[in-house]
């Protein structure tokens, strides 16, 4: 009997460690998806470096209490899977939200963003953000625009001076 309890404690500690280490964890209800759809979702998440796991709700509740994210307990009902991302904050929310558009059976319940419990609306807002590279390129284009405009103006002034001088 104690061997089973030890295994369960290890699973609880594994879940708790995943919550501690992850930038984002998104909790979903996968009820209504067939095996092929779940396999396709797992593949898409795996390609993005996201771990997608199904744990018993009771063990997940204990892990959530261990990492002091008890507000997440409300989402731990019914069939629950969790997508953990250690690197990209946006990717799990974006991939799951896009998958949900094609497969309405998938239900996003909530999650954790950088150690804080997030609501469904916050997860959806996060899904609408571009990834890191997209945000960097947007920032660079915003920073580059004034310099480019200044260059156009100075070129126009130089051309105007040339025309007046000639």
Curated annotation (Swiss-Prot):
Keywords noted in UniProt: Ribonucleoprotein, Ribosomal protein, RNA-binding, rRNA-binding
Q: Which GO terms describe its cellular component?
A: large ribosomal subunit
Q: Which domain of life is it from?
A: Bacteria
GO biological processes? translation
Q: Which PROSITE patterns match?
A: RIBOSOMAL_L10
Q: Which Gene3D superfamilies match?
A: 3.30.70.1730, 6.10.250.290
Q: List the disulfide bonds.
A: none
The answer, when asked if Cell inner membrane is one of the entry's keywords, is: no
Entry GO MF terms: large ribosomal subunit rRNA binding; structural constituent of ribosome
A UniProt-annotated Pfam family: Ribosomal_L10
Does the keyword Ribonucleoprotein feature in the UniProt annotation? yes
Q: What is the role of the protein in this entry? A: Forms part of the ribosomal stalk, playing a central role in the interaction of the ribosome with GTP-bound translation factors.
Write out the similarity annotation: Belongs to the universal ribosomal protein uL10 family.
Can you state the subunit structure given in the record?
Part of the ribosomal stalk of the 50S ribosomal subunit. The N-terminus interacts with L11 and the large rRNA to form the base of the stalk. The C-terminus forms an elongated spine to which L12 dimers bind in a sequential fashion forming a multimeric L10(L12)X complex.
Please state what the protein is called: Large ribosomal subunit protein uL10
